[in-house]
Amino acid sequence: MVFPFWQIEAIAFINKVVDFCIEHENGKVFDGWDEEMIRLIVAYHWAKQTLLVHHNADETIKGVFMWYNCNKDDGWNFINNWEPDREDGDSIFMAFLFSEGKDSFKELTKDFINKCPEVLTKNKIGLRYRSGFPKRINYSNKLFKKIINN
């Protein structure tokens, strides 16, 4: 079977993103997932256009961000159960974020707001590890101001 060039490029891109995510995984984001599961989640976000990748001038990846459109009462099960995005949902679950430094983090945040401006009017949900356990966090727009202005 011969694959079109764009498919080969897409697979190479996804593999590059997966490698970056694995390299920067701290055990709190993908929590024991194997490489194939991470590849599947990256490809899923690429296909549904909820994947941002920040590069430097030489095309080295410096940051990756993936999110879900959901409702305020959705939690980690929404992700684990592979539920489809709720396009009319009232919230955005900021699920997977890897960044090499403050500048990359800022650029990802700006790109996210540009690509998904509705984030400024929707609930923002995330998980953070506190005392060794994941805890649901509800963020405000102050988070974005703090990131961009620091």
Feature annotation, model-predicted:
Residues 21, 25, 41-45, 112-120:
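Hydrophobic, Leu/Ile/Phe/Ala-enriched alpha-helical segments that form helix-helix packing faces
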Residues 74-144:
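Acyl-donor binding region in acyl/amide transferases
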Residues 59-65, 92:
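Glycine-rich phosphate/pyrophosphate-binding loop shared by adenosine-nucleotide-utilizing enzymes
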Residues 1-37:
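Short amphipathic alpha-helix that is part of the acyltransferase structural core
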Residues 39-57, 68-74:
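A short helix-loop-beta-strand connector motif used in the catalytic cores of GNAT acetyltransferases and
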Residues 52-55, 64-66, 124-129:
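A structural signal for short, well-ordered beta-strand segments and their strand-loop junctions
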